[in-house]
Design a protein with these regions (language model features):
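A conserved acidic beta->alpha catalytic loop
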Residues: 22, 37-46, 64-65, 87-93
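Glycine-rich, basic loop-to-helix element that forms the pyrophosphate-binding segment
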Residues: 62-78, 99, 153-156
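Short aromatic/hydrophobic "clamp" motif used to bind/position activated sugar donors
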Residues: 83
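Conserved donor NDP-sugar-binding/catalytic core segment of glycosyltransferases
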Residues: 94-127, 205
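Acidic donor-binding/catalytic loop of UDP-sugar-dependent glycosyltransferases
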Residues: 42-43, 90-103, 185
């Protein structure tokens, strides 16, 4: 068997149904599906049973241990030459498996990954979040874009790897967030050939509201410091940009407030030079933020053919950059300054 598609799932039977439905339309048929139920209260076993006559599908239920360990559980039971790791909230185009096969035939790889896109049926908020998570303006192209500021690391929403390599590297670590980047780093360190398959893309639903999106990106910022503590060389300039943006926005607001406060209080004559300098610097920072916002709006509106999504993309981008930046700064203080151990946030409310 060529492919084993491994999907960890937690309380997402509807998403699993949609994913399995799209798998019935794949032109390539040499695959099995391994669904690992990670302690769900709303299981998808009945959904899986409906597809047993359409594909080779295996359903396993286990106690909750997180997505990384659930993928390992599935990999230990998989039979395919290649393991395809997917999130439950992705949908595959009909030619997905063929695109993977074509790339492997053209240039073999030990591990690989593909980009993600927003489906036309997604909500405007999902499309805005998808834009923010894939745009060069917000990610530096490190998530599979054509322009990039760092090499491509496969992500667990759309990732493939030879089964023998997966087992040799012991799969995913027990990190709660950032476990896919941790695995990709170890893949590179082992000297494996790792590639981006640009045509093996998926539709990725992502978070459905900005509150959940904040929790996700806040933990991503924490995970980057956790990864830095394990692999200091993995921290690149592009990973610092959200933190710089966050501090820049906060700094601009403070400069504007304290720069114009003397004018509002009628005390500008006390420290005129300092007040004017702070106000001027604040205005320069504000101008930069406005220009960046306009660029986001124009680019997203053009890409999504929607002014509304363009406006929502501004909120999504600021949520992503400042959420990541705040998580990054929090983890830097706790781990690098205070010397605390690895941690994550919103553990009890992450999915709510």
């Amino acid at each position: 068997m060529k492919y084993s598609i491994i999907v960890p799932v937690f309380n997402r039977p509807d998403e699993v149904d949609e994913l399995l439905e799209c798998l019935t339309h794949q032109s390539e048929k040499d695959f099995e599906v391994v669904i690992v139920e990670d302690g769900s209260q709303t299981p998808c076993e009945e959904v899986c049973k409906r597809y047993e006559h359409m594909m080779d599908i295996h359903y396993y239920y286990k106690e909750n241990s997180g997505p990384g360990q659930s993928r390992n559980y599935g990999a230990e039971r998989a039979k395919g030459e290649y393991l395809l790791i997917l999130d439950s909230d992705v949908v595959l185009p009909e030619g997905y498996l063929k695109a993977v096969s074509d790339e492997l035939s053209r240039e073999p790889a030990d591990a690989f990954g593909g980009p993600d896109k927003a489906h036309s049926s997604f909500t405007d908020t999902q499309k805005a979040i998808s834009y923010s998570m894939t745009s060069f303006f917000t990610t530096g192209g490190i998530r599979g874009g054509k322009k990039k500021m760092d090499k491509f690391y496969p992500r667990s929403f759309n990732m493939g790897i030879r089964r023998d390599v997966y087992l040799r590297l012991n799969g995913f670590s027990n990190m709660r967030f950032g476990e896919d980047i941790d695995f990709s780093i170890r893949i590179f360190k082992a000297g494996c050939r790792c590639r981006l398959f640009p045509e093996a893309w998926v539709w990725h639903k992502r978070r459905t509201d900005f509150r959940k999106f904040w929790r996700q990106v806040y933990n991503s910022g924490i995970a980057r410091i956790n990864l830095y503590k394990k692999y200091p060389e993995s921290l690149k300039l592009v990973h610092l940009l959200p933190m710089v943006f966050t501090m820049g926005v906060i700094g601009t607001l403070l400069l504007l407030f304290f720069g114009f406060l003397p004018y509002m209080l009628g005390t500008v004559h006390v420290f005129p030079t300092l007040g004017n300098a702070m106000a001027a610097l604040g205005c320069i920072g504000l101008a930069g933020i406005i220009l960046y916002t306009i660029a986001l709006f124009i680019d997203s509106s053009r890409e999504n053919h929607s002014v509304k999504i363009g406006l929502l993309s501004i909120r999504a981008a600021f949520t992503q950059l400042m959420g990541y930046g705040c998580g990054f700064l929090s983890a830097w203080w706790k781990r690098c300054v205070l010397g605390q151990s690895e941690f994550s946030a919103y553990n009890k409310t992450f999915y709510k």
